[in-house]
């Protein structure tokens, strides 16, 4: 990369969401990669200073390594557009839609993309009504949170109530979702092209926050080991799921493949993790792209905003 073309780069990290600690890890990894690539890059934590300082400090573009609320929900993207600062990842609308699992599901269903059935919950929702609709077990999670925070698997009324309360601590929008038994997969999208699929095998329980970021027993396989034909079919559908939300630059589409080899798409992450446990760098490595090359390519795509 010709560093004169990108100028002074701010790596947004940390922030105010429940995923702050993961964002700090992602941001530091991104910052180190950019600096190794001789990019004039600096850390910028919006939790400790106003975004307008980006202009005062002379930044020319932004690498968004924020996760969750106020980072990948369109808020920061809107502020950066008002300041006319190019940034990585998707724009305002796509970021907001992808952050909202409820509205993502509505769009995907309208577009013919397979996603688990769901019911929106409130404090008056009855366990039996929801169980009759979705079957047991079922998943309860906040609609607008990432890293599986507030997510629980339930199969009885007592757990249903406690899981609802746990999810409601993160978001006023809570959904119950059909549980799909199958293989956990993720499809990374880079520059409108799918990368090799990553298969995720959890030792026990769900692929939750602990399993994602701290467990040493969670196993990842990339390439996934699926047949070439099935892999291509999933990648094509994942790319469509990415595009139909209006996503640009890069994203990570999560899904479950059931016993009939039918993919059920769960969500799209528009600012995926970039830690040592993260899946996009793993998929890129399988495609022959080093971590530093991946970070630089994502930054280069910011020129399209």
UniProtKB/Swiss-Prot annotation:
GO terms for biological process: cell wall organization; peptidoglycan biosynthetic process; regulation of cell shape. Mg(2+) 2 binds at residues 267, 269. Cell wall formation. Its cofactor is Mg(2+); Mn(2+). Transmembrane segments: none annotated. It holds the Pfam family Dala_Dala_lig_C. This is D-alanine--D-alanine ligase. Binds 2 magnesium or manganese ions per subunit. Keywords: ATP-binding, Cell shape, Cell wall biogenesis/degradation, Cytoplasm, Ligase, Magnesium, Manganese, Metal-binding, Nucleotide-binding, Peptidoglycan synthesis. Mg(2+) 1 binds at residues 254, 267. GO terms for molecular function: ATP binding; D-alanine-D-alanine ligase activity; metal ion binding. The gene is ddl. Pathway: Cell wall biogenesis; peptidoglycan biosynthesis. One of its GO terms (cellular component) is cytosol.
